Design a protein with these regions (language model features):
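Divalent metal-coordination and catalytic microenvironments
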Residues: 110, 167, 183, 188, ...
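Extracellular/periplasmic ectodomains of large secreted or surface enzymes and adhesion receptors
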Residues: 124-166, 199
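Histidine-rich, glycine-flanked metal-binding segment
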Residues: 174-215
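Divalent metal-dependent hydrolysis catalytic cores, especially in the metallo-beta-lactamase
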Residues: 230-247
Length: 247
């Protein structure tokens, strides 16, 4: 948004050094690793894709930390006049809280072909712009399927009665924490709070809080929701949001 960019990275032997407008670092690095820039551009994906293609395990260590992985989640045939080519939709994970989707050329050393943020941004190789809308549609479908797959892996449906045992309930109205209690839930609602007893009273699911504090769901009063934000909110304890729209 117009802020100055001043970022450098160097590696000499096993020492890596970097400096940005936000931080600076110096660390020892063994073997192959690539710097994850703070103020880079989408074109950096070309470097990442090429480096990943040379890794037999499909994993690329990152500097300062983390590991980048890639998975092909789709393909498309794009056309420019009489010319056509096949490009792959690649999902990159390991940078940020959500995957990044990029379109890559199909080659031994792939490069970035298109970077799309549907409804907001389209970057595509010169001359192939007419394929942008079709690629965006395919990308949205692949992203939706990725979210469905994630939900199937991490969701834990709690049918019937759930007991949260030995929890200390936070009272937000009086800013106090109560004694150990057993909290019963049914269909997503608290039905009863009783003194901790160690009994399960026929509950279908039992979670042992181990004396930890049980907080009510948090409210986020200023959000601009995207497709991946729901899971991130839940992970942070936020159960209610007010979306300020995305215009």
């Amino acid at each position: 948004f117009g802020a100055p960019v001043d970022e450098t990275f160097t590696r000499r032997g096993d020492r890596a050094r970097w400096k940005t407008t936000s931080d600076a670092g110096d660390q020892r690095v063994e073997g192959t690793a690539i710097y994850s820039s703070l103020a880079g551009s989408p074109e950096a994906a070309t470097v990442l894709l090429g480096a990943l293609a040379k890794r037999p395990d499909g994993r690329l260590p990152l500097i300062p930390s983390g590991t980048l992985t890639s998975r092909r989640v789709g393909e498309a045939t794009v056309r420019r006049g009489e010319e056509s080519r096949t490009v792959d939709l690649v999902m990159l994970t390991g940078v940020g809280f959500t995957p990044q989707f990029v379109w890559a050329t199909r080659a031994a050393s792939p490069r970035l072909f298109a970077y799309l943020v549907p409804g907001y941004l389209k970057l595509i190789e010169e001359g192939w712009q007419e394929n942008g809308a079709a690629l965006a549609t395919r990308q949205q479908a692949a992203e939706a399927q990725a979210l469905v797959d994630l939900e199937r892996r991490v969701a834990h449906p709690l049918d019937g009665v759930t007991l949260i045992r030995n929890a200390r309930v936070f009272d937000s109205e009086h800013a106090t924490v109560g004694p150990p209690a057993d909290v019963y839930l049914f269909r997503g609602r608290i039905t009863e709070i009783l003194p901790a007893s160690g009994l399960d009273a026929g509950a279908d699911h039992v979670l042992d809080a181990g004396g930890r504090v049980l907080l009510p769901g948090l409210f986020d009063m200023h959000t601009h929701l995207g497709r991946w934000d729901g899971g991130l909110h839940l992970a942070a304890g936020v159960t209610t949001v007010r979306d300020m729209a995305n215009g």
